[in-house]
């Protein structure tokens, strides 16, 4: 997660429980280094997260600083770059622009920092239809178009996809109990005994059956 507690990281490293860690800040890199040294671990794989302009991840300057000062992290392996800007993206244009931006940054790192990330973890944020009547995604066409974009990149390392909603959304149903029903100003409402945290995102209501 975004918040990493030292005690938790120490426990995970002691149990050999994580193959790869993400770092959201330079402070987290230092924390991972401290915990790895204490656990006697070397080559701990880390993905540094590049921000998309929000509270998550690091800006380009901090990532370049982590590469420049990688000697300060002798127990860590800066294996790759991680990037995720959000979900429910309509069309492929934003995804294409994001990947072109990432490719340009990776080119800069390789050419000017004498360093090359081996991996890129990218969350495309493919859109999933939640409401009745919404157009269903043609997955084959979508993925073929996405593949063409990936094939055009200069980056030739390993690319991992973070596609949680795209994979998980069709795989289950949300069941809850109607506790009360009412009508207010011509609108029908049901009061249910379930939460709403999983049906709201970025101010949008996501309908669930």
PLM regions and their residue ranges:
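Oxyanion-binding "anion nests"
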Residues: 121, 146-147, 160-161
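Charged (often Lys/Glu-rich) extended helix/loop segments that serve as interaction or gating elements
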Residues: 158-209
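Active-site-proximal beta-alpha core segment in soluble small-molecule metabolic enzymes
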Residues: 1-119
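Short, glycine-/Ser/Thr-/acidic-enriched flexible segments
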Residues: 4, 28, 53, 63, ...
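The start of beta-strands in P-loop NTPase/AAA+ ATPase cores
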Residues: 44, 116-118, 124, 157, ...
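Glycine-rich beta-strand-to-loop/alpha-helix junction loops that act as flexible
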Residues: 85-87, 120-127, 163-166
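Short glycine/threonine-rich loop-to-helix capping motif typified by GTGT followed
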Residues: 91-97, 129-142, 169-177
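Alpha-helix-loop-beta-strand connector modules within alpha/beta enzyme cores
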Residues: 43-47, 102-104, 142-154
């Amino acid at each position: 997660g975004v918040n990493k507690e030292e005690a938790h990281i120490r426990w995970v490293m002691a149990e050999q429980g994580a193959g790869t860690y993400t770092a959201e800040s330079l402070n987290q890199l230092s924390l991972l280094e401290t915990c790895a040294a204490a656990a006697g671990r070397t080559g701990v794989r880390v993905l540094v997260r590049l921000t998309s302009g929000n509270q998550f991840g690091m800006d380009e300057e901090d990532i370049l600083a982590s590469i420049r000062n990688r000697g300060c992290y002798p127990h860590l392996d800066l294996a790759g770059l991680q990037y995720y800007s959000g979900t429910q993206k309509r069309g492929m244009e934003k995804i294409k622009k994001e990947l072109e931006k990432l490719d340009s940054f990776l080119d800069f790192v390789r050419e000017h920092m004498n360093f090359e990330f081996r991996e890129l973890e990218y969350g495309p944020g493919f859109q999933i239809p939640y409401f009745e009547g919404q157009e269903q995604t043609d997955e084959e066409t979508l993925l073929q178009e996405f593949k063409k974009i990936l094939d055009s990149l200069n980056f030739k390392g390993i690319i991992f996809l973070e596609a949680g909603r795209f994979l998980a959304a069709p795989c289950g149903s949300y069941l809850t109990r109607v506790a009360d029903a009412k009508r207010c100003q011509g609108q029908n409402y049901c009061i249910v005994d379930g939460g709403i945290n999983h049906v709201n995102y970025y101010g949008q209501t996501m309908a669930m059956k």
